[in-house]
Regions:
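Conserved anion-binding
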Residues: 30-82, 88
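Charged (often Lys/Glu-rich) extended helix/loop segments that serve as interaction or gating elements
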Residues: 163-211
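Single conserved hydrophobic/aromatic residue that forms the stacking wall/gate
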Residues: 1-14
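Conserved, mostly hydrophobic/aromatic
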Residues: 19, 53, 86, 127, ...
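Short, well-ordered coil/turn segments that N-cap beta-strands
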Residues: 23-25, 46-49, 79-84, 118-123, ...
Length: 211
């Protein structure tokens, strides 16, 4: 795995960034191999950098909890890396606030266990809540600010414990632009009228839904 990462140029990317920016910024770690490689690059650049450990929700992204615990347990072996906390993003278009609430409680519980077991106090929590956006006037999204208000109220319970960063994604930018294209053809099949546009399905489809 390590050789594959280096052959893809991940090490070169880190080296270039560290040479250009020094220890500025925060790096998100997706794997134990990436953590080790980042440490080597930081050592060569003679800098100490801040990192967040991305915890997986069970998909291909991030580290599982056991890997995070192992990294934290052995953190003194990597003095070039300063672990600030954890990062998590599990998906988008969440219609139920209970899902968001349970995820934040889960992350808080993970941080508590890291402190109890290894004396590591997470300073930062970065989380993508996946708040929903209405693309086609779906009534389920009519009260678009209600969940945001619930989230703000929930985070009041944690703001003294962590520096919290929210990844708001499409909730902020979904209405920031429009897609303009031309009509190439209009036809009717079995009584259903279709408009053929000069664009690809990747332009009019959106994550988590079918057109």
């Amino acid at each position: 795995i390590r050789d594959a990462q280096e052959s893809r140029g991940l090490g070169d990317v880190y080296k270039r960034q560290l040479n250009d920016c020094g220890g500025v910024g925060v790096y998100t770690v997706e794997s134990k191999e990436q953590y080790s490689l980042l440490s080597e690059c930081a050592r060569e650049a003679e800098v100490t950098i801040d990192v967040l450990l991305r915890v997986t929700s069970g998909n291909q992204f991030g580290l599982d909890e056991e890997d995070i615990k192992d990294i934290v347990k052995n953190r003194e072996k990597y003095p070039e890396l300063n672990i600030r906390g954890v990062q998590c993003y599990t998906g988008t278009q969440k219609k139920k606030f209970d899902i968001i609430k349970s995820e934040i409680e889960w992350l808080d519980g993970l941080c508590d266990s890291l402190y109890a077991d290894y004396g590591f106090k997470a300073e930062e929590l970065e989380y993508g809540p996946g708040l929903p956006v209405s693309y086609f006037g779906d009534a389920a999204y009519d009260n678009k600010y209600d969940m945001l208000k619930e989230l703000a109220a929930l985070l009041e319970n944690y703001k003294a414990k962590y520096s919290i960063t929210l990844e708001m994604g499409r909730y902020l930018v979904a209405e920031c632009g429009i897609y303009v294209t031309g009509i190439a053809d209009i036809k009717k099949n079995k009584g259903q009228q279709y408009v053929i546009v000069d664009g690809g399905i990747n332009h009019v489809n959106y994550y988590g839904q079918a057109m």
